UniProtKB/Swiss-Prot annotation:
Superkingdom of origin organism: Eukaryota
Any one Pfam family match given in the protein's UniProt record, by short name: Moricin
GO cellular component entries: extracellular region
Cited function: Has antibacterial activity against Gram-positive and Gram-negative bacteria. Probably acts by disturbing membrane functions with its amphipathic structure.
Gene assigned in the entry: MOR1
Lineage: Eukaryota, Metazoa, Ecdysozoa, Arthropoda, Hexapoda
Induction info: By bacterial infection.
Record's subcellular location: Secreted
Tissue distribution: Expressed in fat body and to a lesser extent in hemocyte and Malpighian tubules.
Organism: Bombyx mori
Family: Belongs to the moricin family.
Name of the protein described by the UniProt record: Moricin-1
InterPro entries, per the entry: Moricin_fam, Moricin_sf
Keywords: Antibiotic, Antimicrobial, Immunity, Innate immunity, Secreted, Signal
Disulfide links within the chain: none
Length: 66
């Protein structure tokens, strides 16, 4: 486990050193916000569907065992 941690720190350090001279990357902020909104709406829809299913199962008449 210690070797893995050392390797990870080494890779991060090397990437920081090699990228320090490169031009900063342009991040498409608008696209990230759009995807975030879509994912948020999808998660809300799943949450609402789950809640509706729970309420339905609670109110549904239960079958009696013989």
């Amino acid at each position: 486990m210690n070797i893995l941690k050392f390797f990870f720190v080494f890779i991060v350090a090397m990437s920081l050193v090699s990228c320090s001279t490169a031009a900063p990357a342009k991040i498409p902020i608008k696209a990230i916000k759009t995807v975030g909104k879509a994912v948020g709406k999808g998660l809300r829809a799943i949450n609402i569907a789950s809640t509706a299913n729970d309420v339905f199962n609670f109110l549904k008449p239960k079958k009696r065992k013989h």
